[in-house]
Amino acid sequence: MDKKAIELIKEALIEDGVDNDITTLNLVSKDKMLTGSFIVKATGVVSGIDVAKEVFKQINPRIKMEILKANGTFVNRGDVIATIEGPMRDILRGERVALNFLQRMSGIAATTAKFVQELAGTNCKILDTRKTAPLLRVFERQAVRD
């Protein structure tokens, strides 16, 4: 993952206020551990799984996230794309940021895949351009390529 992406993830965590999650900090013991799974809700294409992993790494390097489906993989509802294990408090603090990246990027990848399929057999080609959401270009362009 390039430096720009790592810095943008750091900024996203700051913006989300992960260090000020008073609900989690007050209700979840710092010793409580959690094991969980990322389960697909709709047929699509995985994108951003590496970004989600980096989110948790930045919060706590002790969080273990095993990627079961790589970026660019077609998935169906109910598929498990990753598992996660670590301090519950830290996983909950990063959950929203990780899922936001994962959902946005997977949505872009799935939509791109549909257009690529529609254009199969023609001379047309899907390109990723500079027309992206502010500050998200590095992630959105990756999603198109996935």
Question: What spans do the regions from the language model cover?
Answer:
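Acidic/glycine-rich phosphate/pyrophosphate-binding loops and surrounding catalytic core
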Residues: 2-146
